[in-house]
């Protein structure tokens, strides 16, 4: 015990201060408590102890800075794609995909006695810098499996899962995507973060694709980021840990401005085409999840506060289909088209799109006794036409869930949720993505009728929440949507925002909520629309091919 008070921990710092292009340069600026850049490969039972500070420009993680799928364009001297490439069928391609995906099994990081701090300093959002996570900053097709035994093998009766844990966490700071466990997760096949070397995988497959969509789905799923059996806890149960997206910048005249990270969450900042948890083991008992019986559960323990810009949530900031798969996903006015997705639709099976959705099973968020406070500060307009949506969304569990599913999850000890536009006790914005705009798709109404033939529009484009609940602190939790007095053209055609607040969900656009509850709600406040359970619902369908 005497020696314990003299453990000072160790620091990991990547010195590069700004993004640069060039060979081996765009990947740099990453740091992790165990590994900096992990491109492919497997780690089993690798533990890092007494980590004090991890700091980097592009990506910082308590365990790994970045996990990236290796480039599938060439492997040694063998060219896989292209004019001289090997013509692999998609069955063989699946094996190739798995070779290029990085895997971490049964490995954890423990901060030093006074808590671990993870910081990502990059402000160049365009090039994907500024990602921070308690475990990993950026994962592109990464696999993190804590639901196995210590040797990375499947559990047998009587054996406890080793976990992929972050313990003794004090604070995570970043300027792009910030999360208690992971900054940003996306699929290796559809990466739109600046990974350069590894982003062309799906395009290479499509170029050699003829008409086997079922096989394509299996390849896509092999490169989806999956996280199971991951747990985040603080160093001090009374104080907990914070996810802080606020930072200050100075202009040429020395004036200081406070800015905020795009996405912040108690577990994940941003999720794209990711699967968290296991649908088969998350059944629990009755309608509620039972983490004690679910080795793949994802838990957040001792969360105090989450502060972000466009999206903030107790578990995740933004969970979306990959913007590669979204026509209406960019900033309003941007070039709204995605050739990649249109090629997938022309393949003839809308079911391919399932591979782009984000799924969360058995995510549990437990706040400190004072309660969790979640704040989102920045309002922007995304999408177009009937796919237009506003950011500045906050929720006790998630800020924005766009084309995703959350099942058997809960938030406990919620104090307050504050956002600019869509704010909810559980999720601020349950929405659809502008995956297809009929005039951009050039598919004709016959092709669009595939929606009715192969899947319901709601199943592919809507967002679902099932068997989940939010529980406030004993004094009750509050939900507030406010522009803080700013003029945003309220209720006009030129409005730059829309205040919608609800006790469980703020704005539910083409959404399904089933078997859910909110307890200890105190007050819901909005300048426009407020509801005890849901602020506003809409079923504006996505494809309008008149």
Give the label of every model feature segment.
Residues 1-546:
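Surface-exposed loop/turn motifs in large extracellular/passenger domains
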């Amino acid at each position: 015990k005497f020696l314990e008070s003299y453990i000072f921990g160790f620091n990991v710092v990547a010195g590069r201060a700004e993004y640069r292009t060039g060979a081996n340069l765009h990947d740099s600026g990453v740091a992790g408590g165990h590994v900096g850049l992990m491109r492919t490969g497997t780690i089993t039972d690798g533990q890092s102890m007494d980590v004090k500070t991890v700091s980097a420009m592009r990506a910082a993680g308590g365990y790994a800075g970045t996990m990236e799928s290796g480039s599938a364009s060439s492997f040694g001297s063998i060219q896989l794609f292209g004019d001289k490439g090997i013509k692999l069928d998609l069955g063989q391609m699946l094996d190739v995909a798995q070779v290029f995906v990085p895997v971490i099994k049964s490995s954890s990081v423990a901060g030093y006695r006074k808590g671990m701090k993870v910081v990502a300093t990059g402000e160049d959002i365009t090039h994907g810098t500024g990602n921070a996570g308690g475990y990993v900053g950026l994962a592109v097709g990464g696999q993190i499996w804590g639901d196995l035994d210590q040797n990375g093998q499947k559990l047998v009766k009587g054996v406890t899962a080793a976990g992929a844990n972050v313990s003794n966490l004090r604070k995570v700071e970043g300027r792009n995507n910030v999360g208690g466990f992971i900054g940003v997760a996306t699929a290796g096949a559809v990466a739109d973060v600046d990974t350069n070397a590894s982003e062309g995988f799906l395009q290479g497959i499509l170029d050699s694709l003829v008409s086997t969509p079922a096989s394509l789905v299996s390849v896509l799923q092999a490169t989806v980021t999956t996280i199971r059996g991951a747990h985040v806890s603080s160093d001090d149960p009374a104080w907990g840990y914070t996810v802080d997206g606020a930072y200050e910048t100075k202009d040429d005249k020395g004036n200081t401005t406070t800015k905020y990270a795009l996405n912040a969450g108690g577990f994940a900042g941003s999720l794209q085409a990711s699967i968290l948890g296991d649908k088969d083991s998350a059944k629990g008992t009755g309608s509620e999840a039972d983490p004690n019986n679910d080795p793949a559960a994802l838990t957040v323990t001792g969360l105090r506060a989450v502060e972000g810009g466009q999206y903030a949530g107790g578990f995740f900031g933004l969970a979306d289909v990959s913007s590669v798969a979204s026509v209406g996903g960019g900033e309003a006015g941007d070039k709204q088209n995605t050739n990649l997705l249109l090629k997938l639709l022309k393949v003839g099976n809308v079911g391919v799109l399932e591979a782009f959705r984000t799924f969360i099973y058995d995510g549990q968020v437990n706040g400190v006794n004072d309660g969790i406070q979640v704040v989102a500060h920045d309002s922007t307009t995304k999408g177009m036409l009937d796919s237009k949506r506003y950011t500045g969304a906050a929720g006790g569990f998630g800020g924005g869930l766009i084309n995703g599913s959350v099942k058997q999850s809960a938030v406990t000890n919620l104090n307050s949720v504050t956002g600019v536009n869509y704010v909810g006790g559980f999720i601020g914005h349950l929405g659809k993505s502008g995956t297809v705009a009929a005039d951009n798709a050039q598919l004709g109404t016959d092709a669009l009728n595939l929606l009715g033939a192969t899947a319901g529009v709601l199943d592919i484009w809507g967002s679902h929440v099932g068997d989940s609940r939010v529980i406030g602190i004993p004094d009750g939790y509050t939900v507030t949507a406010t522009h803080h007095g700013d003029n945003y053209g309220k209720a006009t055609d030129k409005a730059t925002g829309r205040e919608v607040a609800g006790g469980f969900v703020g704005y539910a656009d083409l959404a399904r909520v089933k078997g859910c509850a909110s307890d200890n709600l105190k007050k819901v406040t909005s300048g426009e629309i407020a509801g005890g359970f849901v602020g506003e619902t809409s079923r504006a369908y996505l494809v309008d091919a008149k």
